[in-house]
Amino acid sequence: MKKLINDVQDVLDEQLAGLAKAHPSLTLHQDPVYVTRADAPVAGKVALLSGGGSGHEPMHCGYIGQGMLSGACPGEIFTSPTPDKIFECAMQVDGGEGVLLIIKNYTGDILNFETATELLHDSGVKVTTVVIDDDVAVKDSLYTAGRRGVANTVLIEKLVGAAAERGDSLDACAELGRKLNNQGHSIGIALGACTVPAAGKPSFTLADNEMEFGVGIHGEPGIDRRPFSSLDQTVDEMFDTLLVNGSYHRTLRFWDYQQGSWQEEQQTKQPLQSGDRVIALVNNLGATPLSELYGVYNRLTTRCQQAGLTIERNLIGAYCTSLDMTGFSITLLKVDDETLALWDAPVHTPALNWGK
């Protein structure tokens, strides 16, 4: 294994120290470790907080700033942050209007964020939750009960962050997050595995002519391993799966801060249909050249046009990675005029930055 690290035990500490030094708009906290906006708490606005295992950079710490997250809790590589990190971060960013926890659907994340939610409620913080489960590839996986939360998380953090920035209430922000989760669809493929520093070897092996179809962002198995032929064929198979697997029913939990208890809600993922308008994210899983990602986007635009989908906005690049995995994911999020206005609203973070 050759990686630009000193000691595997210091990877998280050193990368966070570098992030904070590179971006004075962020504050790195210690004991426990978490990151916030330097101006947190922001009075009069809902605070957004997310987190998860490291290795997916720039998610989540790269999305802290005006118009997006108030703070983020990074765990060790592919390891959920502990409840005390989440609790302390939320206490730091709470500006009095409540805290919304955006949680990717992985067993460890769910358990730890739910524990922190109850601790926050007991401490008098108005808090609620949104669970993201946009991966259409598999229902259950190595890390999840239910579908995985992947790159649509980035889009939701941007859009809900814009709503919080303009002064929307905690309930409105949470409702928007759940709506966007039901309108977003993602799928990924891998041509090569990632290497976790502590393991020192690739997490799986593929033959030269194989790809992992429906891979997760921790290298979890997907739908199957199948022959890799060409860019167009790969995008076509992914696009068809997004459409075919795009509708499903499931039960998701959220915290009702008024009743002080968990509530279960039946939700339906909305399939993409002709006439829909979308934001398209072509996401580098770590080691895929940008030139290839633009090739992917070229084919994706053709398939969207054929299916009657209009791409209103796009992101192409590394936004939700899996260390050094060779591969990419596609996310399509159904939008309307209001959603696009939130997308176009100013955002100033290390990884997304536009507007005044």
Curated annotation (Swiss-Prot):
Keywords associated with the record: Glycerol metabolism, Kinase, Transferase
Residues forming the catalytic site: 56 (proton acceptor), 218 (tele-hemiaminal-histidine intermediate)
Complex and partners: Homodimer. The dihydroxyacetone kinase complex is composed of a homodimer of DhaM, a homodimer of DhaK and the subunit DhaL. DhaL also forms a complex with DhaR.
Pfam family, one: Dak1
Documented effect of changing residue 56 to A/N: Shows a moderate decrease in the catalytic efficiency but at least a 40- to 300-fold increase in affinity for dihydroxyacetone
A molecular function GO annotation: phosphoenolpyruvate-glycerone phosphotransferase activity
SUPFAM superfamilies: DAK1/DegV-like
The protein's name: PEP-dependent dihydroxyacetone kinase, dihydroxyacetone-binding subunit DhaK
Sequence ranges assigned to domain DhaK in this UniProt record: 7-352
UniProt pathway annotation: Polyol metabolism; glycerol degradation
GO biological process: carbohydrate phosphorylation; DNA damage response; glycerol catabolic process; glycerol to glycerone phosphate metabolic process; ketone catabolic process; monosaccharide catabolic process; pyruvate metabolic process
EC number(s) on file: 2.7.1.121
Alphabetized PROSITE patterns for the sequence: DHAK
NCBIfam families: dhaK1
Keyword S-adenosyl-L-methionine: no
Up-regulation conditions: Activated by DhaR.
Activation and inhibition: Inhibited by chloro-3-hydroxyacetone and D,L-glyceraldehyde.
Biological classification of the source: Bacteria, Pseudomonadati, Pseudomonadota, Gammaproteobacteria, Enterobacterales
Binding site for dihydroxyacetone: 53-56, 104, 109
Further facts: Unlike the carbohydrate-specific transporters of the PTS, the complex DhaKML has no transport activity.
UniProt organism field: Escherichia coli (strain K12)
Superkingdom field: Bacteria
